[in-house]
């Protein structure tokens, strides 16, 4: 055996030679030496006990199982592996099995091989050896891969088997000459110490008890050396009883909550050790249950024996569940370490309770009363596995166990159904299917449940997971070796009442689903979300009436409730900042969160992803919570009415008290007083002066001086308007600052700090030296205060700017379309969403939170804007904090996916990030792709377009998908029913037609690559099925199926913007299709061919709501318009229409017309435009009418340094439409309604500063 061991172990194991070989060698040497000295025959082993005992004692000190972990050598040479390796492993295990069998069969106490107290454990080891051998045979016979792939596995099997054999050998009890080997209790303590954390208080109890018992035993032997010590226990009762009384006072189970130490060693709490410990406890309890002799000091009365039997049954089930988890968990076992530790703690608690409260009768001393013991056992039964301390993550444990449970249910179900004699209920199959569905839901939702939210439900979660595991395990025999009696015990304990056992699991599934959904909701919402929900509810109930039939009544109630709450949301959207603002915002937030929930429930019902019982329960809870919200709003309204009445009475009293009114006037003028006192000295100004007198005094004081004034804590534009007249403009480079604002400049300037300071270098340097650090440190607090006073409806709009890149100009029309699609805009009767959104934007501009970079020449509306870097950083940070917006950049790894909650909106900078994160973004509402690389869209199509169509399926609630200018696509997504905004880049000439489910899409923007701009794009007929389409912008497109366009054009009643269609015979399509779009507001025709004659006839009453008409390089010659066509037209733009004879004279009668722009047109068009202007202004008194004739100014330059500064300076001039710089020809071309002198003045200043 030693020779075989040497030949194999040096090749397979890392031990050369192993301590086992050393042990056998030294034993043989000692045997030979002893025989030579005493001359005793080989079969005279009487004196060998002393030798062997000493030898084992020596090796026990060196051999530290199970702390020693031997590593198997990596086998490099495949030829070095032969079939003898597997054969050798089986031979070694067979030798061990044979030796252990000898130990088990010896029952003579006189034999030195007799094992008195460890036989049950050795039998268990024997069983494990046999199973290990069978498994090795199974692997060798069934593995398809070459055997050398399993060499490492064989090596580990060999190591473990050798370890077990060495432990049995080293700790084999040997009696003789007064030398006793390690007692079972001491062995257990050693193993316990090596495995368990030092913080367990019951370790002290066990150690101290063992010392007391050992001392008693030695004293007994000394006092009575000739008597049988095993029968001399009468005097021990009193000592043991007192000892337990002492420990009971210190041990407070179940009140003690033990913290689980962090385990660094994966082998520390192995399932094998846990099961061994439970086996010891089960064995001890079995002894108590089997003793029926009342005279025995271990006798337990019947009323307590029943409880011990119940605890015994629970321990057996717990042991089986540990075995189940260790066998079935797919993830590595170290992920379940905390679970095993918990089981170990609870099993140890149970054993300690039994020992401490074991009734001891004798000498008049009676242990704890039966009623108290009953209570202790009841506490244990209810507690089962107790929660660990907060902060320890166990998502992974739950998910692993649930995965194992879910995969085992079909096997358990098949196993039980194959047994015809089993007492199952009729609905067993259905109940098991329900259980599997619930566990699947529980696992999927746990993945997205943050740790902090999970900790609130740890105890309930533990109970549910364990109950589910025991229930399923009782139906499935893992190893096929459990005795029928054990299985019957478990089935009897569970009662096979599946509905009753499933109920707590149902409750937990519902709780976790709700919690997982709630934790991913944003804390900032758009007030228009309820509007979209109400529209969708009607559409969903019409489209999916069969799927939603069982929820019809609940949905109708919810719809009515939300409609009744609409007036309140409208008030919140229009109210200014006031004392009740917080209460209103809280109620509005709760309402919108309920709207999110309803949308989720309806979608889950349609897609059959959640059980009906769960969805119905959820809707009933929503109805109840909406009722509570309405009651809170009613209470708030009552308080508000009371406050208004008090204010009204106070105002009337103040009106009757002139003296008090004077004091209030003086109080309101504190700002002017402070400015005057700083300017002319303290105490020189009287408070009794009125505002106009103070203003005049301040103006006169400042007029002859050069001043720098800093005004803090001013938040209203009206205050700046009142102060403006106090600051004379003497052209002496004086400055006014408002440090509390992010925009520090003169009133109404709206300039950021760096732009204002650039106009005065001396002032800028002084401010930078004296105030720079202070402003930098306080910038976050300043912006935070500005954000805090924002009304509820503006917060989401402002934070949304965080989705844009730094130093980028933001197109207003695009921004407003995004706001509307995100449901940030609350509808109001009589106003369009676009008008309301523009009002929101002007409000933000008025608060100096947004900078205007370009205004329209026609009506002065904002066309482009941007944010200061400080404000942009704030938006990104605050949006992430509010679970509103998350930027996912290039350096974020996949590992971070599950560390974040699902945010409402995601901004990506790399296509790879989108692919990696898509699997965890099922609840995300918006995806906006941004790229710092301006050439990103010019990359080959295959580099980033291939994955888009696949990953979009994961974003089931997607409402905004903005890939504009970044991602090239060759398709239109069709399975996103909630999508309202879609923009992308395309370079195909056609888009494949497929069935579309985009019935909510409102904005469709498809832009072309520069190389493909002039190619005609064929749109599939499914585009015309998008019945809610409002904004359609696709350069140079043509319908693929003309008949489909004619047929479906009446469905597009909501279409308001149609940009750049291409028609081969435009007179047919415009008359038969486009002019039927009754709600069309914007029509842009780009390079349209108007047939051979170039004629376009617009009949009476057509385009009733059209506001903007743009003709861009069309081949139009003769334009005939009926008198009552275009009744609401506001803007007409003619660009590059060089063949057009004139603008029809009927435009002089359109009273709504405000603006005409003519660019690159012939003189007759310019003449007709001037005639329309003259008529509109003089005869129609339309003073707001404006005519812009685009002119071009070309300037030569000799030197050129930076075009960004030039564009920036010239763009600030009014009327500038285009700026072109030609380096080769040294030309600067400026187009628009420009003032040539102003342009030359700016260019001259730049020349002086060496910019040109």
Curated annotation (Swiss-Prot):
Q: Which coarse location class applies to the principal site listed for this UniProt protein?
A: cytoplasm
Gene Ontology cellular component annotations, sorted alphabetically: cytoplasm; membrane
Compartments, record wording: Cytoplasm; Membrane
Q: Which domain of life is it from?
A: Eukaryota
Q: Where is the NB-ARC domain?
A: 684-736, 786-830
Q: Which UniProt keywords apply?
A: ATP-binding, Coiled coil, Cytoplasm, Hypersensitive response, Leucine-rich repeat, Membrane, Nucleotide-binding, Plant defense, Repeat
Segments forming domain HMA: 1188-1252
Can you tell me which residues the record assigns to a coiled coil?
A: 543-566
Record-linked PROSITE patterns: HMA_2
Q: Which GO terms describe its biological process?
A: plant-type hypersensitive response
Q: Which residue ranges run through the membrane?
A: none
Q: Where are the LRR repeats?
A: 955-980, 998-1026, 1077-1100, 1103-1125, 1126-1149, 1187-1212, 1213-1236
Q: What GO terms are given for molecular function?
A: ADP binding; ATP binding; metal ion binding
Membrane topology of this protein: Peripheral membrane protein
Q: Do you know which SUPFAM superfamilies this protein is assigned to? A: P-loop containing nucleoside triphosphate hydrolases (SSF52540), RNI-like (SSF52047)
The UniProt entry's sequence similarity note says: Belongs to the disease resistance NB-LRR family.
Remarks, miscellaneous: This protein is encoded by the haplotype B genome of the allohexaploid Solanum demissum.
Q: What does this protein do?
A: Confers resistance to late blight (Phytophthora infestans) races carrying the avirulence gene Avr1. Resistance proteins guard the plant against pathogens that contain an appropriate avirulence protein via an indirect interaction with this avirulence protein. That triggers a defense system including the hypersensitive response, which restricts the pathogen growth.
Q: What is this protein called?
A: Putative late blight resistance protein homolog R1B-11
Q: Which organism is it from?
A: Solanum demissum (Wild potato)
């Amino acid at each position: 055996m030693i020779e075989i061991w040497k030949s194999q172990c040096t090749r397979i194991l890392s031990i050369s030679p192993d301590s086992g070989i050393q042990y056998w060698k030294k034993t043989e040497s000692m045997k030979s030496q002893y025989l030579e000295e005493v001359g005793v025959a080989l079969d005279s082993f009487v004196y060998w006990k002393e030798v062997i005992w000493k030898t084992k004692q020596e090796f026990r000190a060196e051999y530290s199982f199970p702390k020693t972990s031997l590593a198997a050598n990596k086998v490099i040479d495949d030829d070095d592996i032969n079939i003898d390796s597997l054969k050798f492993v089986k031979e070694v295990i067979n030798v061990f099995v044979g030796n252990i069998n000898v130990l088990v069969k010896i029952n003579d106490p006189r034999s030195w091989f007799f094992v008195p107290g460890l036989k049950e454990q050795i039998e268990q080891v024997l069983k494990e050896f046999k199973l290990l051998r069978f498994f090795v045979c199974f692997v060798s016979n069934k593995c398809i891969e070459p055997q050398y792939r399993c060499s490492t596995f064989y090596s580990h099997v060999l190591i473990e088997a050798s370890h077990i054999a060495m432990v049995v050998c080293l700790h084999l009890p040997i009696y003789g000459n007064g030398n006793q080997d390690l007692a079972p209790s001491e062995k257990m303590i050693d193993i316990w110490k090596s495995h368990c954390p030092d913080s367990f208080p019951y370790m002290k109890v066990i150690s101290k008890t063992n010392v007391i018992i050992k001392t008693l035993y030695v004293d007994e032997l000394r006092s009575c050396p000739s008597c049988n010590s095993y029968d001399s226990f009468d005097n021990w009762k009193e000592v043991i009883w007192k000892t337990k009384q002492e420990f009971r006072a210190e041990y407070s189970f179940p009140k003690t909550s033990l913290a689980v130490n962090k385990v660094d060693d994966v082998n520390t709490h192995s399932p094998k050790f846990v099961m061994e410990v439970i086996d010891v406890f089960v064995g001890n309890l079995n002894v108590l249950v089997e003793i029926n002799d009342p005279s025995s000091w271990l006798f337990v009365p019947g009323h307590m024996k029943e409880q011990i039997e119940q605890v015994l049954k629970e321990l057996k089930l717990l042991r089986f569940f540990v075995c189940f988890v260790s066998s079935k968990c797919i993830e590595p076992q170290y992920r379940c370490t905390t679970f095993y530790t918990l089981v170990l703690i609870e099993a140890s608690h149970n054993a300690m309770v039994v020992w401490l409260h074991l009734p001891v009768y004798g000498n008049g001393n009676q242990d704890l009363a039966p009623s108290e013991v009953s209570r202790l056992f009841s506490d244990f039964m209810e507690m089962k596995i107790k929660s660990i301390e907060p902060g320890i993550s166990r998502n992974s444990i739950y998910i692993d166990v649930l995965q194992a449970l879910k995969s085992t249910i079909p096997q358990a179900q098949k196993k039980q159904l194959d047994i015809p004699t089993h007492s199952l209920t009729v609905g067993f199959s259905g109940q098991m299917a329900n259980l599997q569905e619930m566990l699947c839901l529980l696992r999927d939702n746990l993945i997205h449940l943050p740790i902090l939210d999970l900790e609130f439900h740890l105890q309930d979660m533990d109970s549910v997971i364990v109950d589910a595991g025991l229930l399923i395990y009782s139906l499935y025999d893992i190893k096929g070796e459990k005795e029928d009696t054990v299985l019957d015990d478990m089935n009897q304990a569970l009662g096979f009442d599946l509905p009753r056992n499933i109920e707590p699991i149902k409750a937990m599934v519902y709780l976790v689903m709700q919690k997982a959904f709630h934790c991913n909701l944003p804390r900032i919402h758009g007030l228009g979300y309820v509007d979209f929900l109400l529209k969708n509810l009607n559409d969903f109930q019409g489209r999916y009436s069969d799927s939603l039939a069982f929820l019809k009544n609940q949905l109708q109630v919810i719809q009515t409730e939300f409609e009744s709450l609409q007036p309140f949301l409208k008030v919140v959207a229009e109210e200014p900042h006031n004392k009740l603002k917080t209460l209103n915002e809280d109620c509005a937030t709760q309402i919108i969160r309920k709207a999110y929930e309803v949308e989720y429930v309806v979608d889950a019902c349609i897609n059959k992803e959640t059980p009906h019982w769960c969805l119905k329960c959820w809707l009933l809870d929503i109805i109840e919570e909406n009722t509570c919200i309405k009651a809170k709003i009613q209470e708030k309204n009552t308080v508000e009415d009371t406050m208004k009445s008090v204010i009204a009475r106070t105002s009337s009293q103040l009106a009757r008290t002139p003296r008090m009114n004077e004091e209030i006037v003086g109080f309101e003028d504190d700002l002017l007083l402070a400015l005057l006192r700083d300017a002319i000295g303290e105490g020189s100004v009287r408070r009794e002066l009125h505002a106009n007198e103070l203003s005049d005094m301040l103006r006169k004081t400042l007029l002859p001086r050069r001043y720098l004034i800093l005004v803090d804590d001013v938040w209203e534009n009206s205050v700046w308007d009142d102060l403006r007249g106090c600051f004379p403009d003497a052209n002496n480079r004086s400055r006014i600052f408002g440090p509390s604002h992010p925009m520090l400049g003169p009133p109404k300037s709206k300039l950021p700090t760096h732009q204002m300071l650039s106009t005065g270098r001396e002032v800028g340097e002084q401010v930078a030296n004296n105030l720079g650090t202070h402003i930098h440190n306080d910038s976050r607090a300043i912006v935070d205060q500005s954000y805090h006073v924002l009304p509820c409806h503006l917060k989401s709009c402002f934070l949304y700017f965080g989705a844009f890149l730094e130093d980028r100009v933001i197109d207003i029309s695009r921004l407003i379309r995004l706001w509307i699609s995100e449901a940030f805009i609350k509808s109001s009767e009589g106003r369009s969403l676009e008008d309301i959104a523009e009002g929101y934007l002007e409000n933000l501009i008025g608060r100096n939170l947004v900078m205007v970079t370009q205004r329209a020449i026609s009506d002065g509306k904002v066309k482009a804007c941007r944010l200061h870097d400080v404000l942009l950083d704030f938006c990104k940070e605050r949006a992430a904090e509010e679970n509103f917006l998350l930027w996912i950049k290039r350096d974020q790894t996949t590992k971070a996916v599950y560390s974040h909650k699902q945010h409402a909106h995601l901004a990506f900078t790399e296509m790879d990030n989108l692919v990696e994160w898509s699997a965890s973004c099922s609840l995300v509402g918006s995806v906006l792709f941004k790229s710092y690389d301006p050439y990103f869209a010019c990359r080959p199509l295959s580099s980033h377009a291939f994955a888009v169509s696949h990953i979009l399926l994961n974003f089931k609630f997607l409402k905004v998908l903005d890939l504009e200018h970044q991602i090239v696509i060759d398709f239109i997504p069709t399975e996103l029913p909630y999508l309202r905004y879609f923009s992308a880049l395309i370079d195909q000439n056609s888009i494949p037609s497929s069935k579309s489910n985009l019935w909510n899409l409102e904005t469709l923007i498809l832009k072309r690559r520069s190389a493909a701009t002039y190619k005609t794009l064929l749109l599939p007929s499914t585009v015309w099925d998008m019945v809610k389409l409002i904004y359609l912008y696709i350069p140079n497109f043509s319908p693929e199926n003309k008949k489909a366009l004619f047929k479906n054009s009446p469905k597009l009643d909501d279409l308001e913007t149609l940009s750049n269609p291409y028609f081969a015979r435009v007179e047919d399509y415009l008359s038969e299709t486009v002019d039927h779009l009754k709600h069309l507001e914007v029509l842009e025709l780009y390079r349209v061919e108007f047939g051979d004659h170039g004629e376009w006839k617009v009949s009476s009453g057509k385009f009733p709501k059209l506001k903007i008409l743009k003709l861009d390089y069309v081949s139009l010659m003769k334009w005939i318009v009926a008198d009552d066509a275009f009744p609401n037209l506001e803007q007409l733009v003619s660009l590059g229409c060089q063949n057009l004879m004139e603008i029809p004279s009927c435009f002089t009668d359109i009273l709504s017309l405000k603006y005409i722009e003519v660019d690159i047109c012939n003189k007759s068009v310019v003449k007709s435009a001037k005639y329309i202007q003259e008529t509109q202004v003089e005869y129609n008194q339309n003073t707001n009418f404006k005519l812009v004739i685009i002119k071009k100014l070309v300037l030569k330059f000799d030197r050129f340094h930076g075009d960004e500064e030039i564009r920036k300076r010239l763009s600030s001039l009014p009327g500038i439409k285009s700026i072109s710089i030609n380096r080769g020809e040294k030309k600067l071309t400026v187009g628009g309604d420009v003032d040539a002198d102003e342009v030359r003045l700016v260019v001259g200043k730049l020349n002086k500063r060496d910019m040109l």
